[in-house]
Amino acid sequence: CKINPNGREWFDIDDRVNGPEQAEPVIMEMISSLLAAHGLNENALVLVGFSQGGMMCLHCGLRMHPPPAAIVSFSGALLLQEELSALSKLPYPPVQLIHGTDDKVVPYVLMEEAVGVLQPMGVIVDTVERPGLGHGIDPDGLSASMNFLAMHLQK
């Protein structure tokens, strides 16, 4: 991982076009295998990720048919927006975007941009702004995600 030598990444962060598309089939196959191994279907699946993991949750989860029960992205971003908005796939899962206002790695404005793309597509989007938080997850954001997931897994 370029940013953190002890970190992990799904794709080279400098390749935000080809990287997600190359990682997508690997992730989709992993999800399918795990669902099958545990005898579950997509309505029991939630995708939750941080940073690049959040980016890939959005990338894959919004393209899944049937969709997962919900997606939560902490400090992530919506990649390949033009390609996604050209899709006419419905239904979409509900999405929660949680982001710190002081994030220097994945700027807060990217959450606002994602909302501007997703809502016109008919995606139900819940946003959680974390004032003063940098690139991370705090207890209030974690609590918000747990409430969001509980609400959408009860359906």
Which residue ranges define each predicted feature?
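Serine-hydrolase catalytic machinery in alpha/beta-hydrolase-like enzymes
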Residues: 1-44
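Flexible "cap/lid" loop of the alpha/beta hydrolase fold
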Residues: 5-14, 76-95
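Short beta-strand immediately N-terminal to the catalytic nucleophile in serine-hydrolase-like folds
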Residues: 47-49, 74, 98
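Gly/Ala-rich beta-loop-alpha elbow adjacent to hydrolase catalytic centers
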Residues: 48-53, 57
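Hydrolases whose catalytic domains are alpha/beta-hydrolase-1, hotdog thioesterase
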Residues: 56-60, 82
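A conserved short beta-strand
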Residues: 66-79
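Short beta-strand/loop motif that positions the catalytic acidic residue
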Residues: 96-99, 103
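C-terminal catalytic histidine-bearing segment of alpha/beta-hydrolase fold enzymes
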Residues: 109-155
